[in-house]
Amino acid sequence: MGDPAGIKQRYRQFAENECKDYSDLYYRLALSVSEDDEVADFIADMPENQPNLFLASIQLLTGAPDMPATGSALRAFVSRRGGEVRAVMRARRTQTNEVGRCAVLLPALPPGPLALVEVGASAGLGLLFERYHYEFGSTCLGAVDSPVRLQCAATGPVPLPPAVPRIVWRRGLDVRPIDVHDDDAVRWLLACVWPEHRERRRRLEGAIDAARADPPVVDAGDLVDDLPAVLAKAPDDVQLVVFHSAVLS
């Protein structure tokens, strides 16, 4: 549970520090929460009340084009469908699986063959390096026919590999893994993408399609308690790489 005054302050900081220049809609809505007693009281009543969770829950229920666009519309929506918002917020946690990070991680991978372990893997899309197409200026790597096209500007002496390393084994670990064949889970993952970030959404949709033919295994578990058991499953005769995509990106 939260304090309504603290909720207002938190949402104002979220608007100014995270949404400004990145999402006009979330900027407006977060600012409106910071000035609205009724909505702040509603959010404060939730065990998990972070802004991304609240806004993604609304996007899940409405779809991005139909989200409330003003403070008064948000208040009316919460008044009308607050029970549904509450149910989503209690059942879900925010998830991201930004495959664009693979373009930044790729130059850091050692030559193959590799065994990859990603912690905080979500749906495991960040494990599928060889299924995406990469463009580092005039240098192209990866699957030429991939629906996922990743462009990355390389400045300075970036050691680009001659090809995507061969990956012979991969495994993810996440507290709440996403199954790419679970339509409800996929809809939630897409709802966590901010509404204006259409290119990111297209990348995510393409990566989900690429994963469905042969999805990576993502074990349910905690980094501290369960990582050793995952590492023990990796083959001994290849280079083991353990990563979390936000660390290097």
Map each language-model feature to its residues:
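Non-catalytic nucleic-acid substrate-recognition regions in nucleic-acid-modifying enzymes
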Residues: 1-24
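Short N-terminal helix-initiation segments at or just after the protein's N-terminus
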Residues: 1-6, 54-59, 184-188
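Generic alpha-helix detector with strongest preference for long hydrophobic helices that associate
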Residues: 3-10, 39, 82-90, 170, ...
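Class I SAM-dependent methyltransferase Rossmann-like catalytic core
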Residues: 12-17, 27-32, 36-113, 125-133
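Class I S-adenosyl-L-methionine-dependent methyltransferase module
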Residues: 44, 63-64, 91, 95-96, ...
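Conserved SAM/SAH-binding loop
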Residues: 221-226
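Distinct, well-ordered alpha-helical segments
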Residues: 227-231
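A short SAM/SAH-binding and catalytic strip from SAM-dependent methyltransferases
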Residues: 239-249
